Swiss-Prot record:
A lipid is attached at C315 (S-palmitoyl cysteine). The gene is MC1R. Belongs to the G-protein coupled receptor 1 family. It is a multi-pass membrane protein. It comes from the Eukaryota. It comes from Felis catus (Cat). One of its GO terms (cellular component) is cytoplasm. Residues 64-72, 141-163, 212-240, 301-317 are cytoplasmic. This is Melanocyte-stimulating hormone receptor. Keywords: Cell membrane, G-protein coupled receptor, Glycoprotein, Lipoprotein, Membrane, Palmitate, Receptor, Transducer, Transmembrane, Transmembrane helix. InterPro entries: GPCR_Rhodpsn, GPCR_Rhodpsn_7TM, Melcrt_ACTH_rcpt, MSH_rcpt. Pfam families: 7tm_1. The keyword 4Fe-4S does not apply.
Length: 317
């Protein structure tokens, strides 16, 4: 792939010596209204990335260590941790290499830097796609466990889970390769945005339906104990709060990135859209933050996993 300047990339470029430079095909010399540009210090970005790496490595180690966690649900959580780990590692690696290039501490031929850029971009894009896929897979798994509880173990078997996991990884690698190869096509950006919207709708529909079932179940229990309102309202408020946090964090962390992609299609040269483009480094930081939060939402709430995690930490000392 030929070098086309510092902003030729879908997910950033090592040809730009500043890690805070606009990415995703931005017009660097746009003129227009005064914009609010929130820069993220390199040290903070690298620090968040390292925190995410440590957290997700611990999740993978805990699930690998405890055989009681070798079930489809925890395998999906483990794969989500691996995806978040790859997002963090690749983003930190890209920023570190760019800083080294800027400082002159890393010298290399343009072809070598170009090849490394290609590899990192495919890794970042594939990890993002797989992370979204496994968030959807976890939602589907929980939905089946609630609405088909008696048949859950016959529906979600280990072979089926492994086939689903393999399909997600293969699809993520292939799609990310195509996305990077055809980064300058509008269809690529539309596919990414459509994929995000589909995952958001899927998760919202499934979790809202699960909340409705939980409230219905609570009403049934309340009638038996003749205290309908307190029990039902308490569970409903708790469930609604949990749902709001889960979907809110997902949308807050991923939404700006895909808004960025949408505006690239709708108004790539409009001055106001250019103001959004200048904050891409912040949007990538939010995705790293999502990788930090995911273990707390999906993994650390399990008492069995927390116990195993303590054992892993004690063994490491």
């Amino acid at each position: 792939m030929s070098v086309q300047g510092p902003q030729r990339r879908l997910l950033g470029s090592l040809n730009s010596t500043s890690p805070a430079a606009p990415r995703l095909g931005l017009a660097a010399n746009q003129t227009g209204p005064r914009c609010l540009e929130l820069s993220v210090p390199d040290g903070l970005f690298l620090g968040l990335g390292l925190v995410s790496v440590v957290e997700n490595v611990l999740v993978v180690a805990a699930i690998a260590k405890n055989r009681n966690l070798h079930s489809p649900m925890y395998y999906f959580i483990c794969c989500l941790a691996v995806s978040d780990l790859l997002v963090s590692v690749s983003s930190v690696l890209e920023t570190a290499v760019m800083l080294l290039l800027e400082a002159g501490a890393l010298a290399g031929r343009a072809a070598v830097v170009q090849r490394l850029d290609d590899i990192i971009d495919v890794l970042v894009c594939g990890a993002m796609v797989s992370s979204l896929c496994f968030l959807g897979a976890i939602a589907v798994d929980r939905y089946i466990s609630i609405f088909y509880a008696l048949r859950y173990h016959s529906i979600v078997t280990l072979p089926r889970a492994w086939r689903a996991i393999s399909a997600i990884w293969v699809a993520s690698v292939l799609s990310s390769t195509l996305f990077i190869a055809y980064y300058d096509h509008t269809a690529v950006l539309l596919c990414l945005v459509s994929f995000f919207v589909a995952m958001l709708v899927l998760m919202a529909v499934l979790y809202v339906h699960m909340l409705a079932r939980a409230c219905q179940h609570a009403r049934g229990i309340a009638r038996l104990h003749k205290r309908q309102r307190p029990v039902h309202q308490g569970l409903g408020l708790k469930g609604a709060a949990t749902l709001t946090i889960l979907l809110g964090i997902f949308f807050l962390c991923w939404g700006p990135f895909f808004l960025h992609l949408s505006l690239m299609v709708l108004c790539p040269r409009h001055p106001i859209c250019g103001c959004v483009f200048k904050n891409f480094n912040l949007f990538l930081t939010l995705i790293i933050c999502n990788s930090i939060v995911d273990p707390f939402i999906y993994a650390f709430r399990s008492q069995e996993l927390r116990k195993t995690l303590q054992e892993v930490l004690l063994c490491s000392w």
